[in-house]
């Protein structure tokens, strides 16, 4: 994409990717539009942003998140769009500050069919939000994932098992606790929700991790903590403490809240707020119409009304105008998509040359 007011924010082949991305981010941070959005968020106004082409949205989102800090929740129109956005954000913020919060199900909560990888990613994102400190984090999600209510942060805090090197606890006590949380004993762990014991070694696969933990005991004391690879069984990282998180989806419905209620004072970035609200109510209507126990199922999921209530007074940035929550401020970024060249590289060369004569820089 090209920015009319300054250099083009178009990424092509680069010699030094990291330094080039830093330069692009620094240029974006100096634009008046980015500064306006930061000011709007700090003053807690609902802001509509326009004229953001291609990856410009991810670029400016990363700039604003870095400036304002905290937790930023980006709601895309669908799963694929959320995943693509997360991929763009990795380039600007780094993978450790970008999370993907999917649904727990392969298709829909209406059909069941739990998605194991989705449960792990979802739990990891929720844990990152609950334990957030320091630099901003950005969580990418979509309506079907927002539809499922989650265990309240207070209930999670009472459930998560935290173990540190040097802790005085027996393997038997730890075994009893994790079984109460629904973990299953196996010979060798290979997926979240499993644990194994042999000699003084206690392996366990938390639902918030993509690799299992290995706890080495000396008597009733935790001597060491490590992550390890499933395929080789070799340690990859030594740790000072670990959090063992169960499958939060299995908790009683009365302990659950909407994701908007769970995240608290986050900044919400909505691709299309009215579309999201319509999807929430449509999914809820279908679920309850097919449910054998509608009273219980109603507690498992959210609604448009609940989402609007839980985000009332929260900071929100809209990519499209909303009838349900009109913007108080509008900010235009004036970026343009790159021209379609359809493999006619002479056209690309001519365009780059013309832009250079106008004072643009090509990345």
Task: Say what each PLM segment does.
Residues 2-363:
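ASCE RecA-like P-loop NTPase motor cores
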């Amino acid at each position: 994409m090209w920015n009319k007011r300054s250099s083009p924010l178009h990424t092509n082949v680069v010699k030094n990717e990291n330094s080039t991305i830093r330069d692009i981010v620094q240029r974006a941070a100096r634009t008046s539009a980015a500064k306006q959005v930061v000011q709007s968020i700090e003053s807690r106004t609902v802001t509509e942003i326009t004229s953001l082409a291609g990856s410009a949205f991810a670029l400016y989102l990363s700039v604003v998140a870095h400036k304002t800090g905290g937790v930023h929740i980006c709601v895309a129109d669908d799963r694929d769009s959320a995943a693509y956005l997360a991929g763009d954000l990795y380039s600007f913020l780094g993978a450790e500050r970008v999370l993907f919060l999917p649904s727990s199900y392969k298709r829909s909560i209406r059909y069941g069919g739990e998605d194991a990888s989705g449960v792990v990613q979802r739990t990891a994102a929720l844990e990152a939000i609950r334990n957030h400190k320091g630099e901003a984090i950005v969580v990418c999600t979509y309506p079907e994932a927002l539809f499922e209510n989650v265990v309240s942060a207070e209930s999670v805090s009472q459930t998560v098992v935290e173990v540190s090197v040097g802790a005085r606890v027996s393997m038997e006590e730890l075994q009893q606790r994790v079984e109460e949380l629904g973990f299953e004993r196996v010979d060798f762990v290979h997926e979240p929700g499993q644990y194994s014991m042999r000699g003084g070694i206690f392996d366990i696969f938390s639902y918030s991790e993509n690799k299992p933990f290995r706890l080495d005991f000396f008597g009733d004391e935790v001597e060491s903590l490590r992550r390890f690879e499933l395929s080789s069984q070799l340690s990859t990282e030594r740790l000072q403490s670990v959090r063992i998180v169960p499958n939060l989806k299995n908790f009683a419905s009365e302990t659950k809240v909407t994701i908007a209620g769970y995240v608290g004072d986050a900044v919400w970035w909505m691709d299309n707020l009215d579309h999201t609200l319509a999807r929430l109510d449509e999914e809820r209507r279908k679920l309850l119409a097919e449910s054998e126990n509608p009273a219980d199922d109603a507690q498992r999921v959210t609604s448009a009304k609940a989402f609007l209530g839980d985000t009332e007074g929260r900071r929100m940035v809209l990519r499209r105008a909303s009838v349900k929550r009109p913007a108080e401020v509008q900010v235009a970024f004036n970026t343009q998509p790159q021209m379609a060249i359809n493999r006619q590289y002479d056209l690309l060369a001519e365009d780059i040359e013309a832009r250079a004569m106008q004072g643009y820089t090509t990345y």
